[in-house]
Regions:
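Patatin-like phospholipase
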Residues: 2-82, 90-432
Length: 432
């Protein structure tokens, strides 16, 4: 976790994928490489990972907010969000703080806006389910006529694939997420319009037919409501139905890249902080499993874990390979990658759509990122100072030490996650 990549070569360009370009207004030419000639441009990039990944990001952002003495996570110049990260990024760009997000997720007041619940996240795709009920018997009869002459040469896979054409395009519609976010962003000075934001916001989806990466917020795609873009960016195949925007059908932006951090570089960022919850699990079977249980093979955890491990491995390897490539390409840009450890069993074993684990995952995100940032404090302090950001080890240590001394640990960690930074510093005696 926390790899720092210093990009050194001279030209800015695309990542090689078919992508709608960022507008020129969002990618100013670099006129000077000398620090201090202007305020450095900063970017926050939030990757995917389902509901679990999004809550992990909120916990990690709470840690970053507490660490930085002269900057908050709502003061980045550029925000890039993919999948679950699109939801969180849209709130960050609208001035919603990590503690406000946590109070909504945990259903604790006072809240900046109403709670989010399972009904918002998982709204069944009833129209397509109903059509399936009507069409499935007809498809079974048609398939039987087609395959009976080939009996003995037909596999179970052939049958399942033959039936798949009449199944829903996704179990859920994603409409609940879009409606919830639209209501939130239309209240209290927030905006559901990319063009009305003070900061640059880019949300990424994938065109199912053309295979293009679609960057909402860039020229030509900045007139789409933010809430619609978030729904499209998080349309995980088979879980959520593709989202129609104009004449396009869009799916999860994480299919192209789990973070799409090159968008931040193209937008002119000098410091890019990436939170990437999607990390493959290094399963050391010589060590006991979580909670002291005997270690298991990943294959013993079911086909979904096998598939998820494979997806994580592909996405994570590509992210780090591209970071190495950019190291030789771009000058003077620092990228900080914040990720779970490869041995993080909790993040791997928890379902990406687990709503009931939200408090545990947020606390885990805060704890793991906080301790890592403290362990690597000198390195991060030097990097962030180059871009005018001051970080304070004393602030974090005093708050964590104060609340860890409390007997009721779940309540203590919730105070950290849900309390304002000012209140935490006053309670721990480190204000000022």
């Amino acid at each position: 976790m926390g790899e720092v990549v210093n990009l050194k070569a001279a030209t800015r360009g695309g990542s090689g994928s078919r992508t709608r370009p960022i507008s020129k207004r969002s990618a100013p030419a670099r006129t000077s490489k000398r620090r201090g000639s202007r305020r450095d441009k900063t970017a926050l990039v939030l990757g995917g990972g389902g509901f679990t990944g999004g809550v992990y990001e909120i916990g990690a952002l709470r840690a970053l907010d507490l660490l930085a003495a002269n900057r908050t996570i709502n003061q980045f110049d550029v925000y890039v969000g993919t999948s679950a990260g699109a939801f969180v990024a849209s709130l960050c760009a609208n001035g919603v703080t990590p503690e406000e997000m946590m109070r909504v997720v945990t259903h604790q007041g006072p809240q900046a806006f109403r709670d989010i619940d399972l009904g918002d996240l998982l709204r069944l795709n009833l129209p397509e389910l109903a059509r399936t009920g009507v069409r499935l018997p007809l498809r079974v009869a048609s398939l039987a006529r087609q395959l009976l002459p080939q009996l003995g040469q037909v596999s179970l896979i052939d049958i399942l694939l033959g039936l798949a054409e009449v199944l829903p395009s996704g179990a859920y519609t994603g409409q609940g997420i879009e409606r919830y976010l639209r209501r939130v962003l239309e209240e209290d000075g927030r905006h559901d319009d990319f063009r009305a934001l003070e900061h640059e916001l880019y949300l990424v989806a994938t065109d199912l037919d053309s295979c293009e990466r679609i960057v909402f917020g860039a020229d030509g795609f900045d007139d789409v409501p933010i809430s619609t873009a978030v729904r499209a960016s998080g349309a995980l195949p088979m879980v959520y139905a593709p989202v129609k925007v104009g004449d396009r059908e869009l799916i999860d932006g994480g299919i192209v890249s789990t973070t799409n951090l090159d968008i931040a570089i193209e937008a002119g960022a000098d410091l890019v902080i990436v939170i990437n919850p999607i990390v493959p699990f290094v399963n050391d079977r010589s060590e006991p499993g979580r909670n002291g249980r005997p270690a298991r093979r990943i294959s013993d955890m079911g086909f979904s874990k096998i598939g998820y491990q494979a997806f994580k491995l592909l996405g994570h390897r590509r992210l780090h390979e591209l970071a190495s490539m950019w190291e030789e390409r771009y000058p003077g840009v620092d990228i900080v990658l914040i990720e779970p450890e490869p041995t993080d069993a909790l993040m791997f074993e928890t379902s990406i759509m687990s709503f009931s684990s939200r408090i545990e995952i947020a606390r885990h995100g805060f704890q793991s990122v906080t301790y890592h940032l403290l362990d690597e404090y000198e390195r991060y302090s030097e990097i962030w100072a180059r871009h005018g950001i001051e970080i304070s080890e004393r602030r974090v240590r005093s708050v964590v030490d104060h609340f860890e001394a409390e007997e009721e640990q779940v309540g203590a960690w919730r105070k950290i996650l849900e309390g304002t930074t000012g209140a935490l510093l006053r309670q721990s005696g480190s204000a000022g």
